[in-house]
Amino acid sequence: MSLVPKKSIDDAVVKGKKVLIRVDFNVPVKNGEITNDFRIRSALPTIQKVLKEGGSCILMSHLGRPKGAKMSDPKPAKSVRGYEEAATLRPVAARLSELLGQKVEFAPDCLDAASYAAKLKGGDVLLLENVRFYAEEGSKKEEERDAMAKVLAAYGDVYVSDAFGTAHRDSADMTGIPKVLGAGYAGYLMEKEINYFAQVLNNPPRPLVAIVGGAKVSDKIQLLDNMLGRINYLVIGGAMAYTFQKAQGHAIGISMCEEDKLDLAKSLLKKAQERNVEVLLPVDHVCNKEFQGVDAPLVTKDVEIPEGYMALDIGPKTIKIYEDVIAKCKSTIWNGPMGVFEMPCYSKGTFAVAKAMGNGTQKNGLMSIIGGGDTASAAELSGEAKNMSHVSTGGGASLELLEGKSLPGVTVLTNKDAKAPAAAAAAGGDCPCGSGCAAVPAAATATVSMVLASP
């Protein structure tokens, strides 16, 4: 089986409609200024599609992790329920206005925005305040999520999801609204994310190398287990590499190690061997006695790490080996940095991998996918993000997809081959979302699984 194809925004009629778009504007903000607008820019094609065709946009997003108030809480006299200054989307509205070259209306309370929505005309854009100012958005109780979803759904006619970064969340705005409206469409960013991951997981150009880093083996167990049946090479870096190396009997000094995962590391290495997957681990290291950024850290001559030292990046010999394996592959998927790239003296390994992928993509047609989160940040910092085939906007979502899990925010969207509900067809009525589509009832859509081919 493969990823179930979903209807995209191109399948929806948006002219004259108020289109609810769940975007991912969870961007870094410092002193009221956005420091990286990548996620805002990534949503522009979907927004511009609606505006060009004469629809209006009602945008929903979260930012940060505010505590969240209850819908039943008394409304403050001079504020809104759940408001936190550090998590307001007002700076996003200002930046989006600059990018679109037009005014973006801002509703200061996402659940008290009916008057704003009612005034919208074709070509208008409205951004709702942070949906997570309300605890019901991500409540564990379905009835609470549904109550919030009904309020939001009443603002519009058509639902589009372009928030891959939160597709692994079962929330009022990701799964609740399409259930209320009876249909949901993938925006261009969501569609792009799904298509790239589907290709690399189900039918990639080969050889395929997975580059996996980060701090803990325990964080990547399911990813490694799922990917071993799909890849040709496995490159391991970051602190998780030292658990594998201790499991092989090497000295790791005072480097980070999950002692309770040594047997698991041995098991994964054995499974890789059984499946003819070549595993590459560091053969030298950049070390220090303390976790600090010094200009002249110790570089080991071989795989062994001296007593009293911790490894904080891969060494030059390892970099060359990793560059060579990337150069001979046709596809790469990268999740997790090779070292503490935030400190310049430990960034060489991570940046070298990024450069090797970027060069391979631009010069040799390598399919290169960055799995979001810290890896996306590292690619941006290295200057190589623009050279990749795809930089995912979803850290947690991409990780769960690589682990072989289905994503609730994708599963709920209308299937490409969906038929009109029998009752609606018999009555000859319009589809629930008002778009003219053949919509799937909520009950049917909710049971569709987004499944990857078994390794």
UniProtKB/Swiss-Prot annotation:
It is an enzyme of class 2 (transferase). Transmembrane segments: none annotated. ADP binds at residues 214-215, 220, 238, 311, 335, 341-342, 374-375. Keywords: ATP-binding, Glycolysis, Glycosome, Kinase, Magnesium, Metal-binding, Nucleotide-binding, Peroxisome, Transferase. It is found in: Glycosome. AMP binds at residues 215-216, 220, 239, 311, 342. It catalyses: (2R)-3-phosphoglycerate + ATP = (2R)-3-phospho-glyceroyl phosphate + ADP. Its cofactor is Mg(2+). HAMAP family: Phosphoglyc_kinase. This is Phosphoglycerate kinase, glycosomal. It comes from Crithidia fasciculata. The gene is PGKC.
